[in-house]
């Protein structure tokens, strides 16, 4: 009887007294055997409904699969209708909020605004970086008290006759002039009573052939030009002050003569200023 039922092909399940099920690759929705009746699960009201633990307790132990075609599974996805879709309108510009309107019309204005913000930020960052670098470099320089006590030694043989040489001393320009015999006689012959800041030439020099001055105009602090002006001494291009070869003010708005620093000759060829 069993052999006849086995050879009957499609009628084997009808002729057979027993049936058997073969597990497939997918778990069917219905089991071959009728499961025992069980009580429906009761939801614990103390737990929040929309949480991972509660959802995993209500869902099946394994993902539910329904066979739609030949070996084609379809998974079951839990859909939540209470999830709010984020709105990014606050981060978008007003010109591009309307999705039905072309953004090409406002592209130039939006690009111009972006370029303006970028340029402004770049200038601000560059200015801040300049200040930081300046402070860093200035911190490595000598302090004010060191500069105030500093001295400079000048070799006079390097300055030819009739020429003026400029040096930097205590952060200021220092003029050392090698005067000719003509300049010495010319400045010595000037009437002191005609000067705005009366001072004789011999009172401003220790050696007639050497004039040592601080090259800062007494008007507003500009640096005069040597061997220029109406009197052949120094000329301030800022406001037109004229000084003679002794550094005395002769014409223009400057009220005083050029300052003479403290100096001494250590030898016939060397002078120390400071």
UniProtKB/Swiss-Prot annotation:
Q: How does it sit in the membrane?
A: Single-pass membrane protein
- Binding of [2Fe-2S] cluster, residues: 217, 219, 236, 239, 241
Residue ranges occupied by any Rieske domain in the UniProt entry:
187-272
Where are its TM segments located? Answer: 111-137
Family assignment? Belongs to the Rieske iron-sulfur protein family.
Which reaction(s) are listed as its catalytic activity?
Answer: a quinol + 2 Fe(III)-[cytochrome c](out) = a quinone + 2 Fe(II)-[cytochrome c](out) + 2 H(+)(out)
- The identity of this protein, by name, is Cytochrome b-c1 complex subunit Rieske, mitochondrial
Output the NCBIfam families linked to this UniProt entry: Rieske_proteo (TIGR01416)
Q: Which gene encodes it?
A: Uqcrfs1
The protein's enzyme class: translocase
Upper classification of the organism:
Eukaryota, Metazoa, Chordata, Craniata, Vertebrata
The miscellaneous annotation reads: The Rieske protein is a high potential 2Fe-2S protein.
- Mitochondrial matrix topological domain ranges are 79-110
- Compartmental location: Mitochondrion inner membrane
Q: List the disulfide bonds.
A: 222-238
Q: Name one GO cellular component term.
A: myelin sheath
Which is one GO molecular function term here?
Answer: protein-containing complex binding
EC identifiers of the protein: 7.1.1.8
List the cofactors: [2Fe-2S] cluster
Segments on the Mitochondrial intermembrane side according to the record's topology features: 138-274
Show the Pfam families listed in the entry: Rieske, Ubiq-Cytc-red_N, UCR_TM
Q: Return the InterPro entries for the record.
A: bc1_Rieske_TM_sf, Globular_prot_asu/bsu, Rieske_2Fe-2S, Rieske_2Fe-2S_sf, Rieske_Fe-S_prot, Rieske_Fe-S_prot_C, Rieske_TM, Ubiquinol_cyt_c_Rdtase_Fe-S-su
Annotated coiled-coil positions are: none
Q: How is it modified after translation?
A: Proteolytic processing is necessary for the correct insertion of UQCRFS1 in the complex III dimer. Several fragments are generated during UQCRFS1 insertion, most probably due to the endogenous matrix-processing peptidase (MPP) activity of the 2 core protein subunits UQCRC1/QCR1 and UQCRC2/QCR2, which are homologous to the 2 mitochondrial-processing peptidase (MPP) subunits beta-MPP and alpha-MPP respectively. The action of the protease is also necessary for the clearance of the UQCRFS1 fragments.
Per UniProt, the cofactor note for this protein states: Binds 1 [2Fe-2S] cluster per subunit. Fe-S cluster delivery to the Rieske protein is mediated by components of the iron sulfur (Fe-S) cluster assembly machinery that reside in the mitochondrial matrix (including HSC20 and LYRM7).
Q: Which UniProt keywords apply?
A: 2Fe-2S, Disulfide bond, Electron transport, Iron, Iron-sulfur, Membrane, Metal-binding, Mitochondrion, Mitochondrion inner membrane, Respiratory chain, Transit peptide, Translocase, Transmembrane, Transmembrane helix, Transport
């Amino acid at each position: 009887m069993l052999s006849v039922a086995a050879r009957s092909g499609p009628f084997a399940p009808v002729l057979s007294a027993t049936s058997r099920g073969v597990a497939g690759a997918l778990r069917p929705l219905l089991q071959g055997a009728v499961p025992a009746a069980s009580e429906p699960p009761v939801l614990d009201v103390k737990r929040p409904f929309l949480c991972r633990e509660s959802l995993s307790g209500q869902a099946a132990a394994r993902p539910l699969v329904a066979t739609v075609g030949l070996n084609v599974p379809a998974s079951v996805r839990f859909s939540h209708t209470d999830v709010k879709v984020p709105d990014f309108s606050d981060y978008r510009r007003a010109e591009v909020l309307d999705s039905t309107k072309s953004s090409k019309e406002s592209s130039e204005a939006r690009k111009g605004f972006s370029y303006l913000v970028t340029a402004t930020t770049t200038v601000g960052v560059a200015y801040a970086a300049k200040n930081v670098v300046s402070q860093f470099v200035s911190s490595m320089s000598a302090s004010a008290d060191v500069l105030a006590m500093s001295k400079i030694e000048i070799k006079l043989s390097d300055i030819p006759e009739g020429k003026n040489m400029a040096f930097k001393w205590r952060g200021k320009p220092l003029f050392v002039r090698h005067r000719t015999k003509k300049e010495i006689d010319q400045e010595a012959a000037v009437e002191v009573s005609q000067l705005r800041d009366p001072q004789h030439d011999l009172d401003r020099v220790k050696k007639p052939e050497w004039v040592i001055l601080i090259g800062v105009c007494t008007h507003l602090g500009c640096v005069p030009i040597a061997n220029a002006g109406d009197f052949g001494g120094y000329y301030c291009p800022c406001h037109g002050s004229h000084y003679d070869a002794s550094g005395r003010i002769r014409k223009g708005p400057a009220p005083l003569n050029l300052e003479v620093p403290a100096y001494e000759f250590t030898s016939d060829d060397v002078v120390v200023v400071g």
